[in-house]
Every structure is written in structure tokens, then in C-alpha cells.
């Protein structure tokens, strides 16, 4: 199979090229990313354990005091809730940063492939190439910002309608649902914009002003590619994430039993088991997400090639 980047490809060929490059160059990608994958797994384990154990426990305690015992929250529980919420926010932000840095290690190799049509296996196992980390993080954050602005605008509009216009709640719910779906659909070209920004020079909004329209004109190609690739990855994720999902459900059910007056039925080693499970799951997830990143890379190359040929025909 030919793995040249700039080539006109159908969505099937794009997906095939992305997965093909992943399997043929897995050792290269693993060697370039395994250290950051371990760091990602540690952050994922911390965030996952917090969501699976700590948050359900605090929520159950709050519900027990307010709904069962009909009491005001104790100061200790209120403080613990605020502290846990703060830790959750910090870990979420750290997760975004570490995820961007992790995939930057792969994007470095893709940048090398874009420029030279080949990739060199890293010489050392213990080394992290930091090039493109900052650019990848900015691509993440700016893309989120572009999505967040219309979301906040719609939320503000719904608030105004709710406060000053007599509309049925179902009307507002349907309006919010349609608006959210519209934003999600319009956000797909941002994948092309982000890839073009990360792998080339120029500021994000300078690239955005030129590339978003191009991405929008190829919306069907982007959507179909991401949909099919996403379905494949989601199935694999469902399989490999099953232990973490089962543990989370067990913790939640134990807290529900505690809320109903039953003793907490989780064994003493549950916390350690949850941490280890989420750590291993996080490490595996890096290499489950990676083929989708390579698919987006070839999707970007296919669009670029199409635009180059279109411009030549105009000349």
C-alpha cells in the first residue's frame, strides 16, 4: 500500500491508509510516544478514580444528609465537595494538556513524514521530542474556543428567552437540541483546520480564516471518514474499557446501597484495583486513539491534494 500523504483518496482509502500506516509503523509510534503514554495513563487513572470512587461517595453522602435525613449539609461535607470539585477541574485541565502533548509525539513523526515522505525510528527509548507540543496544545485549545463561543451564545439566547419570552419548556429543549446538533455538525471542519495548523506555519486564526471554508466544502468527506473511523475505534474502546466501566458501576451501586442504609460492600483493595485498572486502560487508549489521528492525517492530505489540483485547473 502507498502511504504518500498528498494523494486523492476516498474515505475508504483514507481509513485504510491511516490504519495501514499504524500497523506497519507501530514500533516507531510506540517508541516515540510510550513515555508520554505512561504520563497520560497516570493522569487518566487519577481522573478516572476520582470520578469512579470519590465523586459518587460525596454525592451519596450529600443525598443522604439532604434527602434522607432532611438536614443541612455539614461544613466538612461542603468543604470536601468543593475541594473535590477543584481537584476535578485541575485534573481535567491537566488531562487536556497531557493528551495534547502525548499526540504531539506522534504528530512530530507525521510532520517528518509530510516533509520527507519517510519517518525515522527514534534512536533512544528514553527520550521525548517536545517539538510541536506547544502548537498541538494551542490547536486543541483554540478549536475548543471556536466551539465554545457559539455554545455560550446559544446558552445566553435560551436564558433570555426563558426569562423574557413565554415559551413552553419543550420548545426551548427542542431549540437547544437543534442548535447543539448544528454546532456539532459545523465543528467537523475544525479537524482539518487543526491538522493544517499543527503541521504547518502560521497563526491559528490566520489558518482558520482560510482553511475552515475549505473544510466546510469537504464536509461530507470529513464527516463520513470520522464517522466510520470513530465507529471502529468506539467498538474497540468498548471492549478494552469494559473492566473500568464494570468497576465504576460497582462503585456507584455500592454508594446507592449505602444511601439506602446498607453497609458499603466494596472490598478494601477496591481503590487500588480501580487505580490500576484505569491506569492500564489509559495506556491502551492512547494506542486505540492513535489510528484515528493517522486517519485524520491522511484525510487532511487528501483534501490538500484535491485543492492543489483544483487550483491548477483554474490556472
Specify the residue positions occupied by each region the protein language model found.
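Generic N-terminal leader segments that precede the first folded domain
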Residues: 4-20, 24-27, 34-81, 85, ...
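Interfacial aromatic "cap" segments that immediately flank transmembrane helices
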Residues: 3, 7-42, 122-149, 188-239, ...
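Generic alpha-helical secondary structure signal
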Residues: 15, 26, 85, 99, ...
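Juxtamembrane transition segments at transmembrane-helix termini in multipass membrane proteins
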Residues: 2-6, 17, 54-79, 103-119, ...
Amino acid at each position: 500500500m502507498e502511504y504518500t500523504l498528498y494523494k486523492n483518496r476516498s474515505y475508504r482509502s483514507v481509513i485504510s491508509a491511516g490504519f495501514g500506516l499504524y500497523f506497519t509503523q507501530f514500533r516507531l509510534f510506540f517508541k516515540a510516544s510510550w513515555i508520554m503514554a505512561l504520563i497520560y495513563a497516570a493522569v487518566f487513572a487519577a481522573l478516572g478514580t476520582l470520578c469512579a470512587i470519590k465523586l459518587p461517595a460525596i454525592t451519596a453522602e450529600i443525598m443522604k444528609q439532604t434527602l434522607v435525613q432532611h438536614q443541612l449539609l455539614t461544613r466538612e461535607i461542603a468543604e470536601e465537595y468543593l475541594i473535590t470539585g477543584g481537584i476535578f477541574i485541575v485534573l481535567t485541565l491537566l488531562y487536556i494538556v497531557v493528551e495534547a502533548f502525548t499526540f504531539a509525539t506522534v504528530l512530530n513523526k507525521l510532520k517528518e513524514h509530510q516533509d520527507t515522505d519517510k519517518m525515522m525510528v527514534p534512536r533512544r527509548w528514553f527520550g521525548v521530542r517536545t517539538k510541536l507540543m506547544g502548537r498541538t496544545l494551542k490547536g486543541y485549545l483554540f478549536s475548543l474556543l471556536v466551539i465554545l463561543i457559539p455554545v455560550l451564545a446559544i446558552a445566553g439566547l435560551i436564558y433570555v428567552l426563558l426569562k423574557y419570552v413565554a415559551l413552553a419548556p419543550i420548545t426551548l429543549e427542542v431549540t437547544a437540541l437543534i442548535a447543539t446538533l448544528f454546532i456539532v455538525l459545523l465543528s467537523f471542519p475544525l479537524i482539518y483546520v487543526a491538522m493544517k495548523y499543527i503541521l504547518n506555519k502560521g497563526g491559528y486564526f490566520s489558518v482558520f480564516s482560510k482553511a475552515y471554508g475549505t473544510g466546510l466544502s469537504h464536509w461530507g468527506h470529513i464527516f463520513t471518514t470520522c464517522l466510520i473511523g470513530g465507529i471502529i475505534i468506539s467498538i474497540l474502546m468498548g471492549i478494552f474499557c469494559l473492566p473500568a466501566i464494570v468497576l465504576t458501576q460497582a462503585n456507584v451501586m455500592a454508594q446507592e446501597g449505602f444511601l439506602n442504609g446498607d453497609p458499603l460492600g466494596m472490598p478494601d483493595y477496591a481503590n487500588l484495583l480501580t487505580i490500576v485498572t484505569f491506569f492500564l486502560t489509559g495506556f491502551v487508549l492512547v494506542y486505540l486513539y492513535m489510528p484515528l489521528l493517522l486517519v485524520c492525517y491522511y484525510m487532511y492530505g487528501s483534501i490538500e491534494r484535491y485543492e492543489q489540483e483544483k487550483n491548477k485547473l483554474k490556472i
